Amino acid sequence: MRALIEKVIEQALFEAKSRNVPIYTFALYYDHESPAVSVCIDTEEQSKATVKSMNTYSRIYFGRAVADGDLSGAALWRANIGRSLSLGDFHMVNVARTELAGDFVPGDDFFLALVQALVAAEAKVSAQSGNTESLLLCCSGKDDEVALWWSVA
């Protein structure tokens, strides 16, 4: 399984390099709905645009909740304070993807292999980042599309 995961990472890096995409966020993703391993890559510009759009939308409902005196409701519409982790809004979605067997049931060892493979590829991902100090790596977990995230700086 580790070799398959590493192949997906390598393919994503190849695609990003061939398209001259500076990597701001690199997400190794397990598609829980149709068993597959995939990579999504975001740029700083795309992330900022997504955050701005999210915050514009959220502000409407935040304001309504505050006007209604609903603090619990307002808390649901807090602003994003920095970076998008919404994989579907990334610059490159499913840039490299490999389907797994339809009956595949991931266990803790699978999710550990995801993280370990991405940690092992940190230097390669960093080499394609426009700014390694702001590079973020992400990985899916058993229950979350984005469960872990870390920086290399």
Indicate residue ranges for each PLM-predicted region.
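Short beta-strand micro-motifs enriched in acidic
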Residues: 29-31
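Acidic, proline/glycine-rich low-complexity IDRs
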Residues: 6, 10-18, 22, 33, ...
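Polybasic, proline/glycine-rich intrinsically disordered low-complexity segments
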Residues: 47-115, 122-124
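Short, hydrophobic-rich beta-strand element in sensory/regulatory alpha-beta domains
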Residues: 24-27
